[in-house]
Structures are given as structure tokens and as C-alpha cells.
Amino acid sequence: MSNFNQESVLSVHHWTDTLFSFTTTRDPSFRFRNGEFTMIGLKVGEKPLLRAYSVASANYEDRLEFFSIKVPDGPLTSRLQHLKQGDEIIVSRKATGTLVIDNLEDGRNLYLIGTGTGLAPFLSVIKDPETYERFEKVVLLHGCRRVKELAYGEMITERLPNDELMANISATSWSITRP
């Protein structure tokens, strides 16, 4: 397990009956670019049970945050959804991914489009000051089934005060656009 750090759960937030997020400690050696993902999991017996998760916290924060859906029979999420403060998880020492600002050319508008927990990598991107140096306007479209699934709404509107948050709610044919 030398490729993994053991981290402690600091907090857990249940957004709905199907969505939750949690924060953990962060080993000082863990580096990532905003928008990347890493493998996280739990020790189950002698083997780690791992899945890829986008990092929702920004790379300058001293904690890690992850956003997840609750899958009742999911091998990992059925366990993660019961995390509590003080529990331990394992986090890969390496992050990866191409959904990073470095891979984009500067431009006028940056459109970030995600559904459900696909919002997670964009949470770190909109916290990145470089995003606003390279793009005049940031537009975030978050699609979900129900209004209550619009997780992180307050943080998003604080981060995008002059930019746009658009939500599309499929189960109720409801949408919101904030100029």
C-alpha cells in the first residue's frame, strides 16, 4: 500500500438521500491540478476497494473533498455513504486527468457542463484564480433530476458572482439561469 496515503474523515454532508460529500485530511505530499481525479477507497480485508473520484477541493486547500452518489449495492459507495468523522480512507498518492485548465487555450468564455456528481471536478476549477485570469466569463451548467440535487449552490454562486450558473432539472422540466 505504499502508493496510498491513509486519510481521516473530517466531515460528511448528506445533500439528499442519494448524494453526499466528505472531506478528509490531506497528506502534504499529495499534489494535484484542479480538475484531476484520484483513486480512493477503503481497506476491505487484506485488499483495498478502490474507485476513481474527482477531487472537489482546490489544490491549495489543506483538506480533500469528494462528492459521491449513494449506490445501495455499490461495492464502494454502499460503504462510503456510512462514513463518519474520524473514519479512515485510503487515497492514491497520484492524481491524474485531462480536465484541467492547462489543457485549454485562453478564451473569452469557459463552459463547464456536468450532471450529478460530474460537478465535482468543476468545483476545484471554479476555485482556481487562474481560471478567471484566462477566461472573461465562466458558465457552469449543472444538470440533475430534482432541485434538491443542486448541491454546492451557495458556494457556486459565491465563486461565480459575475459569471453564470445554469441548472437543468430533468424530472420536473424546471430550469434556472442566473445572469
Residue ranges and their predicted role:
Residues 75-179:
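FNR/FR-type flavoprotein reductase catalytic core
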Residues 2-85:
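Ferredoxin-reductase
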